[in-house]
Curated annotation (Swiss-Prot):
Its EC number is 3.2.2.22. Nicks pBR322 dsDNA. Has adenine polynucleotide glycosidase activity on herring sperm ssDNA. Belongs to the ribosome-inactivating protein family. Type 1 RIP subfamily. It catalyses: Endohydrolysis of the N-glycosidic bond at one specific adenosine on the 28S rRNA. This is Dioicin-2. It is found in: Secreted, Extracellular space; Golgi apparatus; Vacuole. GO terms for cellular component: extracellular region; Golgi apparatus; vacuole. The keyword Transmembrane does not apply. GO terms for biological process: defense response; negative regulation of translation. GO terms for molecular function: rRNA N-glycosylase activity; toxin activity.
Length: 266
């Protein structure tokens, strides 16, 4: 498991954690214009496990997250409830997510185990609110972890809202920041702020365009610092259309990891 000590985290340890995560999910043989890419969705192991830790060994609270290596989807997580491993899985989670976060647990999902919605942003926001209003940073992540760890999941209103906020923050700080250096760097800039980094229009448009941007990069058949035509619908920080970028800009400032693409230029 890749461990991220949330309580004692700094911008530097956060960056190291994301580097470890990219290493764990990347295709060991392929690059595209000098950028690493995720492995295929068929390669085993299927998951990388991430432990988010709060507190010292004896009293440590640990959330274990199951992330698909091939697409970086968060499929579920576990904590400890009533002194036992409790898995929490989305309506559309992979069927093996349960045993991935709670090994050997063959119980049928009950009210303590079901996240009552799908893993899309739209579904999470229906319970947790608009993600542009939720700050991303050490303080916001730790506070949401404390609000749900070991708590009764049947407390529909409060638990559901807190859990959805935790998921929205964790997904963006972990999987999206692994995909996009742009998001990683913005989170680092506000890492210790009480409010954290509220995703700007550029970040939000990146989050829904990972495959499209990766494919636009892969389509460029000339090496060097080419101009890349970006997919339609991308916005910059000021909500203006963002239509082109140089390959160097994408490599150095925007992309942390591509989706798995077929690419002529390594």
């Amino acid at each position: 498991n890749i461990v991220f000590d949330v309580e004692n985290a700094t911008p530097e340890t956060y960056s190291s954690f994301l580097t470890s995560l990219r290493e764990a999910v990347k295709d060991k043989k392929s690059t595209c214009h000098g950028m690493i890419m995720a492995t295929t969705t068929t390669e085993l192991p299927k998951y990388v496990l991430v432990d988010l830790k709060l507190g010292s060994e004896k009293d440590a609270k640990t959330f274990t997250l199951a992330i698909r290596r091939g697409n970086l989807y968060l499929e579920g997580y576990s904590d400890i409830y009533n002194e036992k491993c409790r898995y929490r899985i989305f309506e559309d989670s992979e069927s093996d997510a349960q045993q991935t976060v709670c090994p050997g647990d063959l119980t049928l999902p009950g009210s303590q185990n079901k996240i009552p919605y799908k893993k899309s942003y739209q579904s999470m926001e229906s319970k947790g609110g608009d993600r542009t209003k939720l700050g991303l940073g050490q303080i916001t992540l730790e506070s949401r972890m404390n609000k749900i760890y070991g708590k009764d999941a049947t407390d529909q209103k409060q638990f559901q809202k807190n859990e959805a906020e935790f998921l929205l923050i964790a997904v963006q700080m972990i999987t999206e920041a692994s995909r996009f250096k742009y998001i990683e760097n913005k989170v680092k800039d506000s890492f210790d702020d009480a409010i954290g980094y509220k995703p700007d229009p550029k970040a939000i448009s990146l989050e829904t365009s990972w495959d499209k941007i990766s494919n636009a990069i892969a389509k460029v058949n000339t090496p060097g610092n080419s101009i890349v035509t970006l997919p339609k619908g991308l916005l910059d920080e000021n909500k203006k259309p963002w239509t082109t970028a140089t390959m160097d800009e994408l490599k150095n400032d925007i992309m942390g990891l591509l989706t798995h693409v077929t690419c002529k230029i390594k």
